[in-house]
């Protein structure tokens, strides 16, 4: 009898232990975060400080997301990574997908789900003392671009045409970016540099005063980049995209509320990105001058426009399609806009208390 009782007791203990293990495994499974790899369309820099600040403040944790970032250069790399599910989303320029919708083109099963860079990052920069005062003054001048295959060239061409400057009335020189591009402008090899805002800011920080030419009105305040995902992910797991977009939106709000804290959080996670030369105050001032213009383009909303993070306007696409047609890349303008983007998840992106996020950001030390 004693032996029988002992066996019964051991049996109860074993069942209890098994139940505890099962519960623990269930809890662990419930707590496992969803992996989300975001493709950064450039090298790691303070341009992604808003994502890092979002991680630092716990916004991705709150959405149960393990967010990772990988630098990727150009659509030739980004698109295969998306299609092979190596990354879940990418910050991508809009042009390649529009071109892919043309007859005979690849017609990739991709879609933009979030308007990220709400105001184009591309600028027309001239030296501060340049005789070029308007876009119309570029007739007969040489303009510097990243490469002849750069996606923004089509819009540049359309902007010049709108100002009465035919493409064959300017010279175009591929200068890359960085030292060689800046030297081309300083030496008057080119009279206008057509890079993105943070690249131009870097040149100014290095000691070359610049002036930006004003775009024609129809090209102002239109998107240049967004979050691109596969149609399959959008169909199968829209909730994951919504959670990612909400955390990213909160990161943007937080960074804009506390630029200095946002930059310091970026350096905390990427210490190798912090410049080594200069005093702490000088380093902070110079890097903020580079970072802030990017955050302003992320947070751009036209006067009176509802502040709905991630939302596209139809104009973002119609202006681009017209520009690509002017550049010869689009022959058929009748592209269903629903094949390019969706605003379906915008309400989910904006389900948070902006004031609370701003307060948390300002309190971060």
Model segments located where?
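Structural motif detector for alpha-helix initiation sites
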Residues: 7, 134-135, 337
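Secondary-structure end/capping motifs
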Residues: 237-330
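Bacterial N-terminal signal peptides that target proteins for export
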Residues: 2-14
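Short linear loop/turn motifs
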Residues: 68-69, 281-290, 335-347
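Short, glycine-/small- and polar/acidic-enriched structural segments
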Residues: 31-197, 208, 213-221
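Conserved C-terminal helix/tail region of periplasmic/extracytoplasmic solute-binding proteins
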Residues: 314-365
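C-terminal segment of classical bacterial N-terminal signal peptides
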Residues: 20-28
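Pocket-lining segment of extracytoplasmic ligand-binding domains
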Residues: 130, 180-280
């Amino acid at each position: 009898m004693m032996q029988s009782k002992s066996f019964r007791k051991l049996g109860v203990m074993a069942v209890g232990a098994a139940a505890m293990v099962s519960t623990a495994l269930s809890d662990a499974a419930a707590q496992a975060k969803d992996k989300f790899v975001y493709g950064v369309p450039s090298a790691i820099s303070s341009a992604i400080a808003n994502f890092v600040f979002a991680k630092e403040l716990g916004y991705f944790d709150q959405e149960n997301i393990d967010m990772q970032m990988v630098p990727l250069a150009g659509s030739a790399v980004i698109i295969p990574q998306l299609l092979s599910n190596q990354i879940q989303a990418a910050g991508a320029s809009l042009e390649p997908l529009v071109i892919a919708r043309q007859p005979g083109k690849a017609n990739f099963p991709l879609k933009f789900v979030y308007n990220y860079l709400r105001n184009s990052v591309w600028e027309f920069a001239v030296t501060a003392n340049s005789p070029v005062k308007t876009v119309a003054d570029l007739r007969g001048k040489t303009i510097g671009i990243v490469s002849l295959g750069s996606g923004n060239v089509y819009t540049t061409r359309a902007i010049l045409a709108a100002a009465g400057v035919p493409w064959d009335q300017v010279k175009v020189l591929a200068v890359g970016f960085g030292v060689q591009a800046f030297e081309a402008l300083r030496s008057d090899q080119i009279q206008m540099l057509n890079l993105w805002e943070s690249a131009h800011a870097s040149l100014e920080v290095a000691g070359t005063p610049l002036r930006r030419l004003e775009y024609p009105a129809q090209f102002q305040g239109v998107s240049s980049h967004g979050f691109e995902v596969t149609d399959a992910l959008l169909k199968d797991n829209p909730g994951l995209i919504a959670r990612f977009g909400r955390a990213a939106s909160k990161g943007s709000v937080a960074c804009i509320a506390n630029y200095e804290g946002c930059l310091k959080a970026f350096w905390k996670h990427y210490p190798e990105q912090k410049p080594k030369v200069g005093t702490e105050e000088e380093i902070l001032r110079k890097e903020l001058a580079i970072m802030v213009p990017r955050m302003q383009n992320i947070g751009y909303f036209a006067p009176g426009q509802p502040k709905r993070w991630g939302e596209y306007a139809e104009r973002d696409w119609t202006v681009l399609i017209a520009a690509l047609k002017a550049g010869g890349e689009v022959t058929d303008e009748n592209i269903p806009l629903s094949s390019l983007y969706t605003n379906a998840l915008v309400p989910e992106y904006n389900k948070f208390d902006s004031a609370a996020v701003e307060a948390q950001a300002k309190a971060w030390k």
